[in-house]
Amino acid sequence: GGVDSTFLAAAAYRVLGDKALALTACSETFPEWEKKESLSLADLIGIKHVFVEASELNNKDFRKNGPDRCYYCKKERYSVLVQWAENRGYNWLIEGSNADDLQDYRPGLKSLQEMEKVRSPLLEVGLTKEEIRQISKEWGLPTWVKPSAACLSSRLAYGLYITPKRLAQVEKAEEIIRQYCQGQVRVRHHGNIARIEVEP
């Protein structure tokens, strides 16, 4: 349901039609409102859509919540998605990393590049986030103005053990604040302290 993945789903559907299938990995790190948004965006595009159950919390290195957390998250999540796709006869899984991601610290990207069955076409052709937003606008995709998003585990300070309870606390807090604020809302979990970030 993000800017890049929605654009990629729309592009895949334009090229492949009903041969394309959008997958959304559902886990404790994925907020409920994003699940609903994924469904509505798939309906808007016209692409078939399936939720696939995954759990990054199965990985102890992910739960430790170090600076390489995203590496273990992507590894766990995409291993499940690749297995699901292969079992149903799909040759490739494509995901929405873009050219700008090469400029940032992205340990998750490293894990994707280690997977033979995962491709990142937006990155491979050099599309930037701004270009993706512009084309999304031209295609009438509402996500062209959507703020950047990250999974709930990114709200927990490094070193703070990731648990279902802490993820649920963040999701509930953001849900309440979102009733009063437009745009991006993030509640940073620092154990006994929460730091709220909203757009001005």
Model regions and ranges:
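ATP-dependent adenylation/nucleotidyltransferase module used to activate substrates
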Residues: 1-138, 194
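AMP-forming adenylation/ATP pyrophosphatase catalytic core
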Residues: 76, 109-200
